[in-house]
A protein has these predicted regions:
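Post-transcriptional modification and biogenesis factors for structured RNAs
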Residues: 2-250
Length: 250
């Protein structure tokens, strides 16, 4: 990663003995020593507005749009230019990303390979993807030591007065979509929309749906407020809610 100007790494639920050995090895890159270690993918991508999954499509029928690697950089550039943050997600070498992992991805990037030998090891896949991005995004988009799409504190202060209009344009972060998904799931259960046995399937399908809708932060707040209100009414019933305004907002 560091070879291509990328400086922010998050590692999700690593196998501790191997991870500890890698970080403590003589000559271990600063990148590894500064990496975030998180228990779940949802936390790792919470601040990101575009999450890109990686893997070999093969005979699978992908549930997200598939973008060839050479066409990825313009999408990343557009997201950065409008103030978003981008994450690329790589799965474990043995099994790749699971279906559950992919539910947090907006799109899937495919590396062009020989159909007779489509698989690449993890290190190769990371290097090829980051090289392709670095070769097309050289300059301000890949500032050394700076997280992609990060807004500094001084810039944020200067934009305070325009935060509402900015949220109306900025894509909803993965964390915002997760909050919407959680309250919608609760409302579905409270309304007996589907049995609890279907919860795992609903969990997956709902996250894919929210990403296909390409919501803004403003959209996500409104939907969150709406479903919180619906859930409040469902949980309390007509008799308890009369004369009370109930919760509002996001």
């Amino acid at each position: 990663m560091a070879n291509f100007g990328f400086a922010r790494l998050a590692v999700v639920a690593p196998y501790e003995p191997h991870w500890r050995e890698a970080r403590s090895a003589v000559g271990a890159e600063r990148l590894l020593q500064n990496a975030q270690v998180l228990p779940a993918l949802a936390e790792a991508v919470a601040e990101c507005t575009l999450v890109i999954g990686t893997g070999t499509v093969g005979r699978r029928k992908p549930e997200q749009p598939v973008v060839p690697l050479p066409m990825l950089a313009p999408l990343v550039r557009r997201e950065i230019e409008r103030g978003g943050r981008v994450a690329m997600v790589f799965g474990p070498e043995k099994r790749g990303l699971t279906r559950e992992d992919l539910a947090y991805c907006h799109l899937l990037v495919e590396i062009p390979t020989d159909p007779q030998q489509p698989s690449m090891n993890l290190g190769q896949a990371v290097a090829v993807c980051l090289y392709e991005l670095a070769s097309q995004l050289a300059g301000p988009e890949l500032g050394a030591g700076r997280a992609v799409g990060r807004v500094s504190a001084s810039e944020q202060d200067g934009r305070h007065d325009r935060s509402h209009s900015r949220d109306a344009r900025l894509a909803a972060s993965s964390g915002s979509l997760e909050r919407v998904a959680e309250v919608v799931e609760k409302a579905m259960l409270a309304a007996e929309y589907s049995p609890a046995a279907m919860r795992e399937a609903n969990h997956h399908d709902l996250r894919l749906l929210l990403r296909r809708l390409t919501l803004t932060e403003s959209d996500a707040r409104r939907i969150l407020g709406l479903f919180r209100r619906i859930l409040w009414r469902l949980e309390r019933g007509d008799g308890q809610r009369k004369g009370s305004a109930g919760p509002h907002g996001g």
